[in-house]
UniProtKB/Swiss-Prot annotation, chain A:
Protein name: Protein LST7
Pfam families referenced in this protein's UniProt entry, alphabetically: Folliculin
Record GO terms (molecular function): GTPase activator activity
Disulphide bonds in the chain: none
Cellular component GO terms held in the UniProt record: cytoplasm; cytosol; FNIP-folliculin RagC/D GAP; vacuolar membrane
Protein's job: Required for the nitrogen-regulated transport of amino acid permeases GAP1 and PUT4 from the Golgi to the cell surface.
Domain uDENN FLCN/SMCR8-type: 48-212
UniProtKB/Swiss-Prot annotation, chain B:
One GO term (biological process): positive regulation of TORC1 signaling
Modified residues (Phosphoserine): S401
Protein name (record): Protein LST4
Domain cDENN FNIP1/2-type, first and last residues per copy: 310-712
Organism encoding this protein: Saccharomyces cerevisiae (strain ATCC 204508 / S288c) (Baker's yeast)
Matching PANTHER family: MYND-TYPE DOMAIN-CONTAINING PROTEIN, NF-KAPPA-B-REPRESSING FACTOR-RELATED
Length: 242, 828
C-alpha cells in the first residue's frame, strides 16, 4: 500500500470538515480488497458530503494501471483517523484561502500535505458559496523524502489539480448559466462572487447540494477517480525508477 | 574584449561592493546593528558576490513570463538549443492561476531583482492564555529592504493569521512546518511552529520570501529546514540559559513560565542573532535565487539522432582544433566521467565537475560534450517545429539534402565568414562587437570543421567550376579567387603543423596561450581567502585604492581592442592557424547578396521546441493530453467506460473503470532538470556541473565551498578541469574527527557556525589526471575506458567520413556508438 493519497474534502454547512472522496492504491498484483468499503446507507449523508456514484449499488471505484489497483471510496477504513485529522487542520485550524494556491504543511502525525482550496458559487449555501479542497497526502515521517518527491513533480501536481478544478468550475458555470435565463445578471453575480466576505451568515432556508448536481455531470466522480489515479500513478512511478 | 566585458562587470560589482561596504561600516557605530539600511547593504554585497545577475535592473511585470536571465544574453540561438533544448528559457514561473480569477490577486510583481533580495524574518511567541486579547508577542522582526515594499508594509498582526491560523488549536503539541502564499500579495510564508518543554506557549519562526521563489522552495527544502532547525536550537538555547539563570538566582519557581517575550534577544544575544541572519543571507537566499534564475542544461534523449549528430560533430571539432593528434585531453576527460564521475555525481550530491576557463565559448562547448555523458536524461518526445519552405528555395533545399556535410564547398563557408565579419564591423559598441564575435565563432565552428577536414587535400577544382557555372554573375567569380587562396593558405598552415610531429611544436604553441589567457582574466587573483567576507573586503579595498590605475588599464585595453581585431582574437584562440580575412573580401561580399541567402547552415537542432523555464520542463501539454484522454470532458455519458462488479460480505459492489493510460502517458518524462549549468561569472556551490573563470579566486571559492559542504557530510569530491593550463585534477576532501567528541551544549547549538571549535581534521587529496600535457598514472580500468572512448571516437569519425554510407545506416550506427559510451561499465 502506497503512502500517497489524494482526497477531495468539503467544508459542509452543517457537518464541518468532511471527506467526500479518497483515492488510494494497493499492492501491485492484488485486487486491493483491503481498501474496498462495505455497503453503507447513503441516507445518513447529507447531499453536500456524499460521494454520488452513477450506479446506486456501488460504494467503491477501482481501476488498474500497470496491474496496480487504484481505489476511490467515500472514506478510508484504513486511514480514517489520519484523514479526519488532516481536514480538521486544513479547514479549521489554518486560515484557508480558497484561491487555487497551494498550502503545504508537515508534521509527524499527519505527514506532508499539499492542500489546494477552491469554492463554487451557490445561492443555496451559507455565504452563497461552497468550499472544497484537493489534498495530496504523503503519509510518511520523512519530511525530506516527501519534499523531494514534491519537488520532482511540482508542475505536474499543481497543474494536475488545476486542470480538475478548472473543469469543475467551468461545468459549474455552465450549469449555473443554463439554469437562469438572464445571462448578464448571472455573469455579474459570478463576478461579484469574488468580493463576498468570508463570513458565513446563518440562514435556515439553505440546503445542501451535491457536486454532481452543481455541475450537472452524473459522471463527475468517475472522472475525479480516474484523474486522481493517473496523478497518483505518475507520482509513485518515478520514485521507483532509481 | 571578453576580458573587457567581464572586467566591466567586475569593476561595476566592485564599485558597488566598495560603496555599500562603506555605507555599512559608517552606519554601524551610530545605529543598532540591525537597522534596515545597513543590513540591506550587506545583503546586496553578499548577493552581488555570489550571483551574476545585474543589480538594480528594473523589469516590467508584463515581461515576466518571457524574460530570460541576463546570463543568456551572450549566447547564440544554436548554443541555447544545444545546451538547453530551447531558445526561450524564462525564469521559474510563479503559479498563474491566481491571475485567472477575476478580481483576485491584483498585486503584481514590479521588479524581479529587487524582490528577490528582500526577505523578512519574524519570530513570534503565542502565550497560552486564550482569554488574553493580545496573546501574541513579537520577539524578532527583521526586513531587508532599503526601498519600501509590500513585504515590509504588512503588519505582524496580519501575518499572525497565516502563521498560527485560527485560535482553534489542535490537542497535540507537534512541531509543524508550513509553506503558504499570502493572498493579495506576492509573498510566500515559510513557518515552523514548535513548543518549548511541552508548555502551552507556541513559538513560530517565519520567513517571508517573494512568490517567484515558490517553485524552488521544495527543492531547496533541506537548506531551508536546516536554517529553521538552527534558529530553533538558538531560541531553545536562549530559553534554557534563562531558566538556568533564574534557578541560580533563586527566582525560579514551578509556577513561573519561561517565555521568549521576557528576553530581549537583540540586546542580550546580538552575536547569535547576527549569525542566524547571515546564514540566511549568504546560504539560503542565494541558493533559492540560483535554483530559480540560473538556467539548467537539458540532457537530450540518447535516441535523438539530431542531437547525437551535433554531439559527435562537436567532439570532432574539439579534437581537431584543441587537442591535436597527440594529446588525449578530451578522451581522458570523457573516460574519467564515464567510468567514475557519472556515478559519483549521482550518488554524492556535493561532488562537482568544474571547468575553469577564461573563454566562455570554449567552456560552453566542453560543457555540451561532457553533459551528454551524465544522467538523468530526458526520455520524452522532442517537439519538432515544422519549417516553412518557400517555393523558390525548395530546389536549393532539395539539392542540399543530397549533399553530405563533408562535401560542403569551401566557397560557401568562406563567404559566411566574411559576412559575419562584415556584420561585426558595422557595430560601434564594443560590447556588441563581443556578442557578434561569439555569434560568429559559434556559427563558424561547425562549418569550419568541414573546411579543416578538407585541408588534407588540394581544393577540388571541380567544385569551383560547379559554383561558377551555377552563377551567371561576373562579381561572383571575384569571390572565388580570394576564397580559394584563403583555403589554400589555411591548408598549408595545417599541413605544416601536422608535418612537424615534434612535441616541442605543440609546446611552442602552448607558450603563446598565457598571453591571450591573461587578456581574458576577469578579475585580479587573490592569493589567500579565509572566508567570503575577507574576499569582499579585499576586493573592495583593492578597487578603492587603485581605481584610477584600473580605469587607465581599462581604457588602454579598450583602445587596443578595435572592432576589427576582436573577431580575430576570438578566432585565434580556437583556430590559431587561420588568418583574418582582409578588407577586399568584405568589399566583394557586397556585390553578391543573393548568394548569402542560399548558404545558411542548416543546424540539425534548429527546429527543436521545448517548453521550459530555468528549472523545469513544462507539463502543460502532457496534462492537457492526459485530461482529454482520461476524463473525456467532451463526453456526456461514460456508461461504456466502466462495469459493475458484484460485492460480497466484505465489500459492496465495485465500479471498475477502464485504464485509459497508454505508453505515452504511462511514463512521465523528466520534469525537474538536474543541477547542471553553463558558464557562470562566479563559481556557484549549488550546481554540480558548471564552468567559471579561471584563476586563483575561483579555485579558492571551490575549495571553500567543499569545506562548507563538509559541515553536513564527511566526504566530498570535485573534478577540476583547467583549460588554460590543461589540467585535470581530482580533488577529494575528507573530515576526520580527532580527540574527545564530547561537546558542551553551547557548542552543540552553534554546531554549524563555530567550525574552528570542532575537533576534527580536514584531509585533502589531489590526484592529477592530466597535467602539463602529460597523462598521470591511471588505473587499469580507467586506461581501458580511455581506449574505449578513443576507439569509439575513431569509429564515429570513419562513419561520418565515409560518403558512401546510407544516411539512415549512419544515424543508427552513430546512435549505437553513443549508447555504448553512455552505458559503458567497467565489467564490459
Amino acid at each position: 500500500m502506497s503512502s500517497t493519497v489524494i482526497s477531495l474534502a468539503h467544508f459542509c454547512d452543517k457537518h464541518g470538515p468532511r471527506i467526500i472522496s479518497v483515492t488510494q492504491s494497493a499492492e501491485k498484483g492484488t485486487l486491493g480488497e483491503e481498501l474496498l468499503v462495505p455497503d453503507y446507507p447513503t441516507e445518513s449523508y447529507c447531499e453536500s458530503c456524499l460521494l454520488q456514484f452513477p450506479e446506486e449499488s456501488t460504494r467503491s471505484m477501482r481501476c488498474f494501471i500497470e496491474d496496480v489497483p487504484f481505489i476511490t471510496t467515500q472514506y478510508s477504513s484504513i486511514r480514517y483517523q489520519l484523514l479526519n485529522s488532516i481536514i480538521k487542520r486544513a479547514f479549521s485550524e489554518e486560515t484557508m484561502i480558497y484561491d487555487n494556491m497551494p498550502f503545504i504543511f508537515f508534521d509527524d502525525l499527519r505527514g506532508l500535505n499539499l492542500v489546494i482550496g477552491f469554492k463554487l458559487y451557490d445561492e443555496n449555501a451559507r455565504g452563497n458559496e461552497r468550499r472544497y479542497c484537493f489534498i495530496l497526502t504523503v503519509d510518511s515521517r520523512s519530511h525530506d523524502d516527501s519534499m523531494k518527491m514534491l519537488s520532482e513533480h511540482w508542475n505536474f501536481i499543481i497543474g494536475g489539480f488545476d486542470k480538475m478544478i478548472a473543469y469543475i468550475k467551468n461545468i459549474h458555470k455552465s450549469e449555473f448559466l443554463g439554469k437562469n435565463k438572464t445571462v448578464e445578471n448571472n455573469l455579474e453575480t459570478l463576478n461579484n462572487n469574488a468580493f463576498i466576505g468570508s463570513y458565513l451568515r446563518a440562514n435556515k432556508s439553505k440546503f445542501g447540494r451535491n457536486l454532481v448536481s452543481l455541475t450537472d455531470d452524473k459522471f463527475l466522480f468517475v472522472r475525479i477517480h480516474k484523474w486522481n489515479s493517473f496523478l497518483l500513478h505518475t507520482v509513485m512511478n518515478e520514485n521507483k525508477l532509481p | 574584449m571578453l576580458g573587457n566585458l567581464l572586467r566591466n562587470k567586475t569593476s561595476s560589482s566592485g564599485f558597488e561592493k566598495s560603496s555599500e561596504h562603506s555605507d555599512f561600516s559608517s552606519v554601524v557605530p551610530n545605529v543598532p546593528v540591525y537597522c534596515k539600511a545597513a543590513s540591506t547593504g550587506t545583503t546586496k554585497t553578499a548577493a552581488g558576490a555570489l550571483l551574476d545577475t545585474a543589480v538594480n535592473v528594473e523589469k516590467p511585470s508584463e515581461m515576466l513570463s518571457t524574460t530570460s536571465p541576463p546570463i543568456l544574453d551572450h549566447i547564440s540561438d544554436d548554443l541555447k538549443l544545444k545546451l538547453f533544448g530551447s531558445r526561450d528559457i524564462p525564469y521559474s514561473r510563479p503559479i498563474d492561476t491566481l491571475q485567472n480569477n477575476g478580481g483576485l490577486g491584483t498585486d503584481k510583481i514590479t521588479s524581479i531583482n529587487e524582490k528577490t533580495y528582500a526577505f523578512r524574518i519574524l519570530i513570534i511567541e503565542e502565550a497560552g492564555q486564550m482569554a488574553c486579547r493580545n496573546n501574541y508577542r513579537d520577539i524578532f522582526d527583521y526586513t531587508t529592504s532599503k526601498i519600501s515594499n509590500s513585504m515590509e508594509q504588512i503588519r505582524p498582526s496580519e501575518l499572525k493569521e497565516y502563521i498560527f491560523g485560527s485560535p482553534v488549536r489542535s490537542s497535540d503539541l507537534t512541531q509543524c512546518d508550513k509553506i503558504r502564499t499570502i493572498p493579495n500579495s506576492d509573498l510566500v510564508l515559510i513557518t515552523r511552529i514548535f513548543y518549548y518543554t511541552h508548555q502551552y506557549n507556541r513559538i513560530a519562526i517565519s520567513l517571508c520570501i517573494p512568490r517567484i521563489l515558490l517553485p524552488v522552495v521544495a527543492e531547496s527544502w533541506s537548506s531551508i529546514s536546516s536554517w529553521l532547525t538552527q534558529t530553533q536550537k538558538m531560541l531553545i538555547g536562549f530559553l534554557t540559559k534563562n531558566r538556568i539563570m533564574q534557578e541560580n538566582t533563586g527566582n525560579y519557581s514551578n509556577n513561573s513560565v519561561i517565555k521568549l517575550s521576557n528576553i530581549d534577544i537583540r540586546t542580550h544575544y546580538p552575536k547569535e542573532i547576527e549569525i542566524m541572519v547571515q546564514t540566511l543571507q549568504k546560504r539560503v537566499i542565494p541558493g533559492l535565487r540560483s535554483m530559480s534564475e540560473i538556467p539548467r542544461l537539458f540532457l537530450y534523449p540518447e535516441t535523438f539522432k539530431e542531437f547525437v549528430h551535433v554531439w559527435f560533430k562537436s567532439i570532432f571539432n574539439w579534437i581537431e582544433i584543441k587537442d591535436g593528434p597527440k594529446l588525449g585531453f578530451l578522451p581522458l576527460l570523457m573516460a574519467m566521467i564515464i567510468s567514475d564521475y557519472r556515478h559519483t555525481i549521482r550518488e554524492l550530491k556535493t561532488s562537482k565537475i568544474v571547468i575553469l576557463s577564461g573563454n566562455m565559448v570554449v567552456a560552453n562547448k566542453l560543457l555540451f560534450i561532457l553533459s551528454a555523458l551524465l544522467e538523468p536524461k530526458y526520455k520524452g518526445q522532442i517537439t519538432i517545429r515544422r519549417e516553412n519552405i518557400r517555393s523558390d528555395s525548395s530546389a536549393v533545399s532539395r539539392n542540399k539534402s543530397n549533399n553530405n556535410f563533408v562535401d560542403k564547398p569551401e566557397t560557401e563557408l568562406s563567404t559566411l565568414t566574411s559576412t559575419d565579419n562584415l556584420l561585426s564591423r558595422t557595430e560601434n559598441n564594443s560590447n556588441h562587437n563581443y556578442n557578434n564575435s561569439n555569434v560568429s565563432s559559434n556559427s563558424i565552428g561547425s562549418p569550419n570543421f568541414h573546411s579543416l577536414r578538407k585541408g588534407w587535400q588540394i581544393p577540388n577544382r571541380r567544385n569551383s567550376n560547379t559554383s561558377v557555372s551555377v552563377s551567371s554573375s561576373e562579381s561572383l567569380a571575384e569571390v572565388i579567387q580570394p576564397s580559394s587562396f584563403k583555403s589554400g593558405s589555411s591548408s598549408l598552415h595545417y599541413l605544416s603543423s601536422s608535418i612537424s610531429s615534434q612535441p616541442g611544436s605543440y609546446g611552442s604553441w602552448f607558450n603563446k596561450r598565457p598571453t591571450i589567457s591573461q587578456f581574458f582574466q576577469p578579475s585580479p587573483s587573490l592569493k589567500h581567502n579565509e572566508s567570503w567576507e575577507r574576499l569582499q573586503t579585499t576586493a573592495g579595498n583593492m578597487q578603492r585604492t587603485s581605481s584610477s590605475s584600473s580605469l587607465q588599464q581599462a581604457t588602454s585595453r579598450l583602445s587596443l581592442t578595435t572592432p576589427q581585431q576582436s573577431p580575430s582574437i576570438s578566432e585565434y584562440d580556437e583556430y590559431p592557424w587561420m588568418g583574418t580575412p582582409g578588407s577586399p573580401n568584405v568589399g566583394d561580399v557586397s556585390h553578391a547578396p543573393p548568394l548569402v541567402k542560399n548558404i545558411s547552415y542548416k543546424f540539425p537542432l534548429k527546429n527543436v521546441e521545448l517548453k521550459r523555464d530555468c528549472q523545469r520542463i513544462s507539463q502543460d501539454d502532457l496534462l492537457d493530453e492526459a485530461f482529454e484522454r482520461i476524463c473525456q470532458p467532451s463526453l456526456a455519458d461514460l456508461n461504456s467506460t466502466y462495469e459493475i462488479f458484484p460485492g460480497n460480505s466484505s465489500y459492496a459492489d465495485i465500479l471498475t473503470t477502464d485504464s485509459d493510460i497508454d505508453d505515452g502517458l504511462m511514463n512521465k518524462p523528466l520534469e525537474l532538470l538536474p543541477k547542471y549549468t553553463m558558464y557562470l561569472t562566479h563559481f556557484n556551490n549549488f550546481f554540480q556541473l558548471q564552468a567559471c573563470p579561471a584563476g586563483q579566486e575561483s579555485e579558492s571559492r571551490i575549495t571553500n565551498s567543499m569545506k562548507i559542504d563538509l559541515l553536513k557530510a564527511d566526504y566530498t569530491r570535485s573534478l577540476l578541469v583547467s583549460l588554460r593550463s590543461r589540467d585535470i585534477r581530482d580533488v577529494a576532501l575528507k573530515r576526520e574527527f580527532t580527540g574527545n567528541n564530547n561537546n558542551n551544549s553551547n557548542q552543540n547549538i552553534y554546531d554549524e557556525n563555530f567550525v574552528g571549535k570542532r575537533k576534527y581534521v580536514l584531509k585533502q587529496k589531489t590526484r592529477k589526471i592530466f597535467s602539463c600535457g602529460k597523462i598521470g598514472k591511471l588505473s587499469t580500468s580507467l586506461e581501458n575506458c580511455v581506449n574505449f572512448v578513443e576507439n569509439s571516437i575513431k569509429s564515429a569519425m570513419m562513419l561520418y567520413d565515409d560518403n558512401g554510407i546510407d544516411s539512415e545506416l549512419r544515424d543508427s550506427e552513430a546512435l549505437r556508438i553513443f549508447s555504448s559510451l553512455v552505458h559503458y561499465c567497467n565489467a564490459g
